[in-house]
Amino acid sequence: MFYKLRRAGSALSKMGAVDFATTIAPGLRDVLLTGKACEVVKRKEKKQDNAYDFVILDAPPTGRIARFLNVNSEVSGLAKVGPIKSHADSVMSVIASEQTTIHLVTLLEEMPVQETLDGVTELEQAGLPVGGIFVNMTRPPQLNAQQRALALTGQLPAAEIETQIARSGLAPSRQLVDVLLAEASDHAERVDLEVNELQRLTEQELPLFVLPLLPGGIDLGALYELATIMTAHGIGEGQ
């Protein structure tokens, strides 16, 4: 936690000054916490035995990502010189360098997408290296565009649906047909929303890494499935 602060960090901890300082200056905690991640990154430069090929830091929510990573601005009003300023400079030498890539993760919903777009703008304004956008939990369309239009306007052929139910070996009923029509309408509305939000993200001209919704949840097999998709996107090749 106190990488580059050395004895000053130990003294601050013993005095309880860290908790006090981070209470009145919350940004200082971010400055202190990022130090360890940067120390791990620098192990590779020093060719240490405990170095890693890649270091992944799960940052705070998108709405405060720029403030969390732009540590120099966080300490500018607190310290112009001294160990805290030196620590911030050391952290920024890693975060703002070419060896760092900041990816954002979003869902295809209005608020998360807007937060992501705002986050990209804030990161770029801070001069921080934006990578790509991971689009999580996407749903493959079960209906084509024409069918979705009919579903949204309640014009799907109920009689044909009832016939298909009977062919599947189930007992057709008006109640079951109505349930399926309602689900089709909800699905069409959701797909149209995702299409529109994906278009907004595409306009950023950043790499998009689209990952599917896995209804069965996450287990080892699901992790391998997602890893295969990300590898196909080129993740892991310097990204």
Regions found by a protein language model. Name each.
Residues 1-56, 62-68, 73-92:
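Nucleotide-state-sensitive switch-loop elements of NTP-binding domains
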Residues 38, 101-106:
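Short glycine-rich or small-residue beta-strand-to-loop segments that form or flank ligand, phosphate
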Residues 56, 103-105, 134:
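Structural motif
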Residues 59-60, 138:
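Conserved Walker B
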Residues 61-64, 109-112:
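Gly/Ser/Thr-rich loops at beta-strand to alpha-helix junctions
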Residues 78, 106-107, 184-185:
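Short, contiguous strand/loop micro-motifs
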Residues 96, 100, 110-239:
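C-terminal lobe/tail of nucleotide-utilizing enzymes
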